[in-house]
Amino acid sequence: MSIRKMIALHPDVAGDPNEELSVAARHAMFCAALCTSCADACSAEEADMRQCIRSCLDCADICEAMTKVAVRRTGENVDVVRMLLETCLSTCELCAEECEKHEHEHCRLCALMCRECAGDCRAALPAFQLAA
């Protein structure tokens, strides 16, 4: 079962799950797990990794919130989805920057996932931009 398929089956979606948002939700879910794992691994390192741990845990929480809101299709809350996509994008970029400061393999993988998630959020944003 995939997030995209589940969303497509929602009665209010009529078979159009918003592919970009579905991908962003899926990768934000993965990003949350990787950030949590990276924070845990950082806590076992001998170096002072407090800022990296904080960045990873903040990113995990934002990604989880974005995923939960993005998969809801009953009613509309376009402004909230847009704000969460923007926040997720920014938080993932900040977390990636922090992880890239460290040479640990878990930080490298976390940074890669954060960059991918940020790109997915960026791709999903146009459907939620304010009309000019």
What are these regions (language model features)?
Residues 1-132:
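Amphipathic alpha-helical hairpins
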